[in-house]
């Protein structure tokens, strides 16, 4: 199929999106999540292909179920034959060379998942491209779905460094949360990775005290041959030291506009990444020990043309009803109080907050809405790194702690 100059197929012009509104509370029914339900842990070890086989064998039924729901969601959103949409998306992009160059073991991991589940490699490959598919659809029309609120706090004498986020995803992923515990292998450190069955990464931490959380920045320029977000996350977490992790995030070509909050032992960093540049972001230049972000770029100006006007309104303060702006303001108000002790309890209170009921940081799963808090994650860095996470929104699920074996 012929491509346009940005590598996106012309078929997009025929798509008519049907996007449900996230905030139509009258049409949404809240679903209670059991507080006793924990995110299952799946142990992975060996090389990439072996890890993929283990992933698929452990979650074969769940992967079959969530792939079916994923395709139903695409069908609903596009009104087109879902297999045709996936095939056109696959042909319109060219991510494989970047994956093979920067994270070759992950390409083998996808082969292993396909082999052990019986799912086609094309389906397994495209399922990884959560943000990249949103970009593909956004080429035609902005669906208006905002996702994720995150922050990071550097270490002091009274507490270690933390990074944390509410990972907000589409409703069809509800119930398929998984925590991968990956053994160290061939120079790569031990890792804990939050994910969904069939997906290789959403965020995570390694045993050397390096962690990463992410936020979609749909407004930024994308690339049809860059490195996808899931692979960027795993690439960062494969590094043994901070210098290598920072070099990686700055060197690769990024497939999607994305904000990366990276914690390295005692320090925290925030980078807004687009196809053409990676820019470090400081919410307060006088306080580099605190970072926070939602879903609109604040320092990277590598914008898609159709976002220029709306971005001006957000940055000028005119768009005060913007979902991302409201959540960003909520984070700022909560995290910049002069008497904050930055205890774990404060982090949890922030992640559970609903300061604006229509635009909350914590999104309960509701039937009829598009997005919910898939999991809330607190990553503790330093000499004793760990992950705490919930199954779905943190107001309805308790945080469960997982620590590394040799720490």
Question: Predicted segment positions?
Answer:
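Bacterial Sec-dependent N-terminal signal peptides
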Residues: 1-30
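Exposed boundary/loop context
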Residues: 2, 14, 39-41, 45, ...
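Intrinsically disordered, low-complexity, compositionally biased regions/tails
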Residues: 11-13, 50-52, 154
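C-terminus-biased signal that marks the final domain/tail of proteins
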Residues: 27-147, 236-278, 283-407
């Amino acid at each position: 199929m012929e491509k346009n100059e940005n590598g996106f197929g012309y078929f997009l012009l025929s798509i008519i999106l049907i996007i449900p509104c996230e905030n139509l509370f009258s049409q949404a029914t809240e679903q209670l999540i059991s507080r006793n339900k924990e995110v299952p842990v799946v142990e992975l070890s060996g090389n990439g292909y072996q890890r993929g086989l283990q992933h698929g064998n452990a979650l074969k039924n769940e992967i079959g179920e969530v792939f079916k729901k994923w395709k139903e969601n695409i069908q609903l959103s596009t009104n087109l034959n879902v297999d045709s949409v996936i095939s056109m998306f696959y042909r319109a992009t060219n991510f494989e060379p970047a994956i093979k160059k920067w994270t070759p073991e992950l390409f083998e991991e996808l082969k292993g998942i396909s082999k052990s589940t019986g799912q086609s490699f094309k389906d397994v490959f495209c399922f990884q491209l959560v943000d990249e598919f949103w970009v593909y659809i956004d080429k035609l029309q902005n669906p208006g779905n905002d996702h994720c609120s995150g922050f990071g706090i550097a270490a002091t004498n009274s507490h270690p460094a933390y990074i944390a986020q509410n990972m907000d995803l589409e409703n069809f992923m509800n119930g398929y949360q998984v925590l991968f515990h990956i053994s160290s292998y061939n120079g790569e450190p031990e890792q804990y990775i939050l994910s969904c069955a069939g997906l290789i990464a959403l965020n995570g931490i390694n045993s050397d005290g390096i962690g990463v959380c992410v936020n979609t920045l749909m407004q930024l320029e994308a690339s049809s041959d860059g490195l996808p977000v899931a692979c960027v996350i795993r690439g960062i977490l494969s590094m043994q030291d901070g210098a290598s992790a920072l070099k990686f995030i700055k060197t690769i070509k990024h497939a999607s506009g994305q904000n990366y909050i990276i914690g390295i032992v005692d320090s925290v960093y925030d980078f807004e990444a687009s196809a053409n540049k990676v820019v470090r972001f400081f919410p307060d230049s006088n306080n580099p020990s605190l970072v926070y972000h939602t879903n609109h770029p604040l320092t990277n100006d590598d914008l898609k043309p159709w976002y220029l006007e709306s971005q001006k309104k957000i940055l000028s303060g005119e768009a005060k009803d913007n979902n991302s702006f409201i959540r960003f303001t909520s984070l700022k108000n909560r995290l910049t109080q002069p008497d904050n002790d930055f205890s774990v309890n404060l982090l949890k209170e922030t992640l559970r907050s609903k300061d604006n009921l229509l635009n909350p940081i914590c999104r309960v799963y509701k039937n009829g809405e598009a997005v919910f808090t898939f999991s809330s994650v607190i990553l503790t860095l330093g000499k004793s790194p760990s992950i705490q996470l919930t199954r779905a929104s943190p107001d309805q699920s308790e945080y469960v702690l997982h620590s590394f074996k040799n720490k």
